[in-house]
């Protein structure tokens, strides 16, 4: 691997479920990989749901059982000259080490690693995993409980993790989701 190549670690993270973390992880990874040509990998560390792994398995089964979908998938992957990005199931407490091992063993340089993390700081290793991210994106909704929880979560990241200085975090970005139009 090129020593100058810098892989970016990204997580969509929040203390609440149902705000869109897994959806945004999938959408962003897919756009970067399939549309913009970046090499990405996703680590699904959201125990016990592991919704991204389940989605991958469900989608693969659906494609393999349908000739029309097989042809479309073949056309897509030959057109862009890329395989599907990998989704790897792992535990939050050692996901950073697993990601670094994957990057080191990869034949192609990995541009971005996305992490689908559990929605609670009570999960073993979650604060360490968050401290290893370069960019954290936090979806918020117009629900008072979710907003308060998100602000407390963001304050925790800034006051506890970032002020200690033992972090890779460059940005924490809050954004609105599920907004009525």
Protein language model features and the residues they cover:
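A generic secondary-structure signal
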Residues: 31, 101-105, 156-164
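Short, function-defining helix-loop hinge/capping sites that tune catalysis or transport
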Residues: 25, 52-54, 112, 123-124, ...
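Short, well-ordered alpha-helices that flank and scaffold nucleotide-derived cofactor binding pockets
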Residues: 26, 30-34, 57, 131, ...
């Amino acid at each position: 691997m090129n020593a100058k190549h810098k892989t970016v670690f990204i997580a969509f993270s929040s203390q609440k479920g149902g705000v869109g973390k897994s959806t945004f992880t999938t959408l962003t990874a897919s756009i970067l990989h399939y549309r913009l040509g970046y090499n990405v990998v996703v680590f699904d560390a959201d125990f016990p749901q592991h919704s991204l792994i389940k989605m991958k398995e469900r989608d693969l089964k659906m494609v393999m059982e349908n000739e029309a979908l097989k042809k479309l998938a073949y056309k897509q992957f030959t057109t862009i000259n890329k395989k599907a990005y990998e989704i790897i199931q792992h535990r939050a407490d050692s996901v950073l080490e697993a990601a670094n091992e994957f990057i080191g063993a990869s034949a192609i340089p990995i541009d971005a690693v996305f992490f689908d993390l559990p929605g609670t700081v009570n999960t073993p290793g979650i604060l360490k995993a968050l401290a290893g991210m370069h960019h954290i994106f936090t979806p918020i909704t117009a629900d008072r409980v979710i907003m308060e929880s998100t602000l407390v979560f963001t304050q925790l990241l800034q006051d506890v993790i970032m002020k200690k200085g033992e972090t890779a975090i460059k940005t924490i970005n809050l954004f609105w989701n599920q907004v009525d139009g």
